[in-house]
Amino acid sequence: MKRIIIVGATSGIGKEVAMIYLKTDCRIGIAGRRTDALKELQAIAPDKIEIQPIDVTQEDATDNLLKLIEKTGGMDLFLLSSGIGNQNIELKPDIEIRTAQTNVVGFTRMVDTAFNYFKQHGGGHLSVISSIAGTKG
């Protein structure tokens, strides 16, 4: 049975990917900031889904990802689907900083942790959902 970890699974593409994997013979670990949304998804298939609240902008995100991997029984595929994008016509620094914390620092935390897990365990698949908004405005 494949073990899939999805960070950013409480909405959007991450949630839809989790729903697709529910139809397969996989064990799924899902993470996101909204605990209530995680619990709603887990209620659909409590025998197949493990949950762990993770805010990728926080320093404990890496420890929480490792907890989720352990709960799920390991990891064969990691999908990072967390990210934000806001129009910031006035270039307010707080909006830019929050975006960078999520899309750069959070990305780095999660991908580094997943990569190192795979390196220690003989491989796996690392996948991310990103955007070209930075080049297209």
List where the protein language model places each region.
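Conserved glycine-rich cofactor-binding loop
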Residues: 10-11
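Conserved glycine-rich Rossmann-like NAD(P)H-binding loop of the short-chain dehydrogenase/reductase
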Residues: 26-40
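Rossmann-fold cofactor-recognition segment
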Residues: 45-60
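Hydrophobic positions on the long internal alpha-helix
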Residues: 79, 110-114, 118
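Conserved NAD(P)H cofactor-binding loop of Rossmann-fold oxidoreductase domains
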Residues: 81-87
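Short alpha-helical oligomerization interface
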Residues: 89-101
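Residue(s) in the substrate-gating loop at a strand-loop-helix junction
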Residues: 131
